[in-house]
Amino acid sequence: PFYKVHGTVRLIEELPQFEQISAEFFGGAVSLKQNVGSQNKKGLYDLSGKVDLTRLKNHFSDKVGAQSRQLLNALNGNIGFKGNLALSNNLTDVNLNLDLNALGSNLPQPLDKKRGSNLTGQFKYQSVLNDSTSNRSSQWTAQIGKNISLQGRLNAQGIMSQGIGIDASPVMPDSGIGINLQANDLNVDDWHSLLYPKIVATKNPAQRSAPEVSQTGLSRDVDGLNVLNASVRNAVALNRQWPNLTLNAKLVNGIWQIQAKSPRLEGQVQYIDRPGFDLVKGKLSRLNIPESSSKVFGAGGKPETQATPKTVPLNSIPELDLVIDQLSINQYKPGAAVIKTLNIPNKISIQNLVITNAEAITKGSGEWSVDAQGSNEAIWLDLKAEIKDLGRVIAHWGSPKAVEGGKGLVTAKLDWSGPPYDPDLDTLGGKIAIALENGRLLQVDSGIAKVIGVFSLQSLLKFASFDIQGSLGNVITTGTSFNKLSGDFVIRNGVARTQNFGMQLNQARVATSGLVNVPKQTQDLRITIFPTID
């Protein structure tokens, strides 16, 4: 839209001829005058001016899709341009040099920019009228600095497609936006929050008293992101580092088809963007979940250590329906896993969790929740492990050569404050029951905690190391076999109590009662040995 237009226009037989035009254009001034060197070439003009991005955003706010609007809203300042415009009956050509020094960008890395920092660009646009159909099509290219390339087109049917290349060649989808990216650092969480914002809406109180997390319908954004190819040396997703990540994603019928590969992640999944909570569904050949990241990326992509690692809001975690062939959690390697969750605001219900390997099958369910303010995370789990080879199960959880053989059943009902990956052991509560048989202790100082290492409670029963040679002789030594190992434990505020933990050996029965402080790893126990006399 042009305002306050001044100048001279000569109406000639073919096209209007502009001699000197000035106007207000998106909050800035624009000037159009005939090129002084174009006496023999009609329709060539010098074009210069400036655009205020606030006015530009206001104009297009209701004319573009939600994702394009999110991108525009992250820009501020103004853009200067200078170049030429060529007009003919069938063709419009624009060639501009861009002054982007006064442009500011709050987009995540690598597209952030401070106002006042030097940046230039070039923009070329061409529009062609087809005489036979009277339809017009357009195409354009742009170069922003040394790293960003753009290509776009608008066909005669009004379908727009645009490719963006960041340190890579642009990739053009059939419609919408395609991004091809190579970067040293990329925070996927920041980009996802920008392009897929969640809003909280409340339905009729008579229908539902709790707030419902809803989405802005971005999967129907026809001019939004449709293709993403990325190769990132240091990627952050779910506040975790994923090195050397290659990602290929395409939006098909509103569903993202994603193929990912990294030393910590490989497989194919669907990411379904939907009202309420998104869904991640598919199969991974491997998933190694690292510890949460303690670094953020500052200006220029330089890593900066933050005092407290950023946590992922529970309501931003999608529902999961995954099959994982090889699951690792930090240094632990439990095996294959199946997980299915169902989300409601402030709560993730773990409907089905199955961890399978040659040594055991563990099945479970549970809940991960926060309060109405999104704080005070809490977990409860109901687990049952059918142990086929206790020694190999313990080896999976990081303590090889502690026990040989052993089979049976371990059940646990546990709860604590904090997320599942960072429990507050001072709040640990619940019950554990152990019923195992036919095993052999290879390390008497390894701790019976290793017996239930499958639950990551290595310190829970550390008292049962039975390294008590001084008073009990050689009743229990390295290589001692046990016929039965059983007991029940009640846990409250991180303190586990038992009255009936015992081990049946060929030569004796060992009975233990007392308590263990899990966070402090201290114990107060009474151990009684009943020798077997032939």
What do the PLM-derived regions correspond to, one by one?
Residues 1-2, 6-8, 15, 20-86, ...:
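Small-residue helix/turn framework positions
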Residues 17, 134-136, 252-254:
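A short, compositionally biased
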Residues 129-205, 277:
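Long, domain-scale non-catalytic interaction/scaffolding regions in large secretory-pathway
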Residues 202-218, 296-310, 467-471:
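Intrinsically disordered, low-complexity segments enriched in small/polar residues
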Residues 170, 216-223, 309-314:
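Short boundary motifs at domain starts and secondary-structure transition points
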Residues 123-125:
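Long beta-strand-rich cores associated with HINT superfamily self-processing modules
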Residues 144-145, 153-155, 166-170, 186, ...:
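Alpha-solenoid helical-repeat scaffolds
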